[in-house]
């Protein structure tokens, strides 16, 4: 096994084709990390010109100290049963990490627990310290240890039927409601950032500046690994649909009124049907007024939600999502999610990753809503083997490990105070 010098394109091709590859190991992802002070180095090992393993090493300075942390996010990308390749990757990583004055090498492989026996054993044998099997969104991890993934390698009907029943009904309703899902361009990031600000204010979290999303889009869109989707509501088109539904409801009432006059047996049923239709008419009249007001103010329509969809080979990722407070009954997010899944499938993806979660948290948990949303999309829990540290400077590592919990608690307190404002 030997060190190899490969191009960025060769690195990315290996990551995208390897079952343990991940978005965070793509070379263009490292470009997105520069804004937050990270810089990258890359390594590869192989035999007879054939690549056996790669890794993208991210480095960040420790504040006020001449040291760095080496972080291999969702790496190494290698067959973890191949001890020789794994050992060669570690040797290469140590060489670079020491040159960059790293106090530790941290990895969190994209390897699931039920397939991770070799990885766990071989990493520990090499001297890696396992950080344990904590909850998916534990503050002790950089990346979530658990994510929710929908298999999308199936036709439209099979995909829809894989969703939980109530969610399936909502998707079907969303498709009828009259929103349009657009695959947007860079200009659409302005709208997305505005929606993200609204979402943050509603849900109580700090949001990123537009430059953050532009950075991701600029780095990954050219290779087809980042797409922006926006959901639009056209008032004129939907007023026409509401008028059609109102006409149908009035016709329905006339039909049941006629039955009431001709059949005493059906009188009770007819009255119930009439009452139901009248309730629907009242709701549609309210909706029509709202749409007419919208048409006066925004005749071109408004955007209700948006998302960034990412790719790494056969894996797709719902990275960021945002939505308006208006016209939520149109279920724009349901229309968008189903559309993005189909788009991802059509562009070679077999899985759709909703991102981090805990495993079936209690209803009073701050993470319950996140889990409840993600579980209804035909997802399974992807539980990773977690983080591992290879210590290069034991005294500094111990010091930072002792200080880190206090910093985490301080960040949580600040975050909670901001939420209450």
From Swiss-Prot:
<keyword id="KW-0808">Transferase</keyword>
<comment type="similarity">
    <text>Belongs to the FemABX family.</text>
</comment>
<keyword id="KW-0046">Antibiotic resistance</keyword>
<keyword id="KW-0573">Peptidoglycan synthesis</keyword>
<keyword id="KW-0133">Cell shape</keyword>
<dbReference type="InterPro" id="IPR050644">
    <property type="entry name" value="PG_Glycine_Bridge_Synth"/>
</dbReference>
<keyword id="KW-0961">Cell wall biogenesis/degradation</keyword>
<comment type="subunit">
    <text>Monomer.</text>
</comment>
<dbReference type="GO" id="GO:0009252">
    <property type="term" value="P:peptidoglycan biosynthetic process"/>
</dbReference>
<keyword id="KW-0012">Acyltransferase</keyword>
<dbReference type="GO" id="GO:0071555">
    <property type="term" value="P:cell wall organization"/>
</dbReference>
<dbReference type="Pfam" id="PF02388">
    <property type="entry name" value="FemAB"/>
</dbReference>
<protein>
    <recommendedName>
        <fullName>Lipid II:glycine glycyltransferase</fullName>
        <ecNumber>2.3.2.16</ecNumber>
    </recommendedName>
</protein>
<keyword id="KW-0963">Cytoplasm</keyword>
<dbReference type="GO" id="GO:0016755">
    <property type="term" value="F:aminoacyltransferase activity"/>
</dbReference>
<dbReference type="GO" id="GO:0008360">
    <property type="term" value="P:regulation of cell shape"/>
</dbReference>
<dbReference type="InterPro" id="IPR016181">
    <property type="entry name" value="Acyl_CoA_acyltransferase"/>
</dbReference>
<dbReference type="GO" id="GO:0005737">
    <property type="term" value="C:cytoplasm"/>
</dbReference>
<dbReference type="GO" id="GO:0046677">
    <property type="term" value="P:response to antibiotic"/>
</dbReference>
<comment type="function">
    <text>Catalyzes the incorporation of the first glycine of the pentaglycine interpeptide bridge, which is characteristic of the S.aureus peptidoglycan. This glycine is added to the epsilon-amino group of the L-lysine of the membrane-bound lipid II intermediate (GlcNAc-(beta-1,4)-N-acetylmuramic acid(-L-Ala-D-iGln-L-Lys-D-Ala-D-Ala)-pyrophosphoryl-undecaprenol), using glycyl-tRNA(Gly) as donor, in a ribosome-independent mechanism. Involved in methicillin resistance.</text>
</comment>
<dbReference type="InterPro" id="IPR003447">
    <property type="entry name" value="FEMABX"/>
</dbReference>
């Amino acid at each position: 096994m030997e060190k190899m010098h490969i191009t960025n394109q060769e690195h990315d091709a290996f990551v995208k084709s390897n079952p343990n590859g991940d978005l965070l190991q793509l070379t263009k992802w490292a470009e997105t990390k520069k804004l937050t002070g990270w810089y990258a180095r890359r390594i590869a090992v192989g035999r007879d010109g054939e690549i056996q393993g790669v890794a993208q090493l991210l480095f960040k300075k420790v504040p006020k100290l001449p040291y760095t942390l080496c972080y291999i996010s969702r790496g190494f990308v290698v067959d973890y049963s191949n001890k020789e390749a794994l050992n060669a990757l570690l040797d290469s990583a140590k060489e670079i990490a020491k040159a960059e004055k790293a106090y530790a090498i941290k990895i969190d492989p994209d390897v699931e627990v039920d397939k991770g026996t070799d990885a766990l054993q071989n990493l520990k044998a090499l001297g890696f310290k396992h950080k344990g099997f904590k909850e998916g969104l534990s503050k002790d991890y950089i990346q979530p240890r658990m994510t929710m993934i929908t298999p999308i390698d199936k036709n439209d009907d099979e995909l829809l039927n894989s969703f939980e029943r109530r969610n399936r009904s909502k998707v079907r309703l969303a498709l009828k409601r009259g929103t349009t899902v657009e695959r947007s361009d860079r200009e659409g990031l302005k709208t997305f950032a505005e929606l993200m600000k609204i979402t943050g204010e509603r849900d109580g979290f700090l949001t990123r500046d537009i430059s953050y999303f532009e950075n991701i889009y600029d780095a990954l869109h050219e290779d087809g690994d980042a797409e922006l989707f926006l959901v639009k509501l056209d008032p004129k088109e939907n007023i026409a649909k509401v008028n059609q539904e109102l006409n149908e409801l009035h016709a329905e009432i006339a039909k049941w009124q006629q039955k009431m006059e001709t059949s005493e047996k059906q009188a009770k049923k007819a009255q119930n049907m009439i009452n139901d239709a009248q309730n629907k008419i009242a709701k549609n009249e309210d909706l029509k007024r709202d749409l007419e007001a919208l048409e006066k103010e925004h005749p071109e329509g408004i955007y209700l939600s948006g998302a960034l969809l990412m790719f790494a080979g056969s894996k797709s990722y719902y990275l960021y999502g945002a939505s308006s407070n208006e016209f939520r009954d149109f279920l724009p997010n349901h229309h968008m999610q189903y559309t993005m899944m189909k788009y991802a499938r059509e562009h070679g993806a077999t899985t759709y990753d909703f991102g981090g979660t805990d495993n079936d948290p209690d209803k009073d948990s701050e993470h319950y809503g996140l889990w409840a949303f993600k579980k209804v999309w035909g997802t399974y829990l992807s539980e990773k083997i977690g983080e591992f540290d290879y210590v290069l400077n034991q005294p500094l590592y111990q010091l930072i490990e002792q200080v880190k919990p206090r910093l985490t608690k301080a960040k949580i307190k600040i975050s909670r105070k901001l939420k209450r404002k």
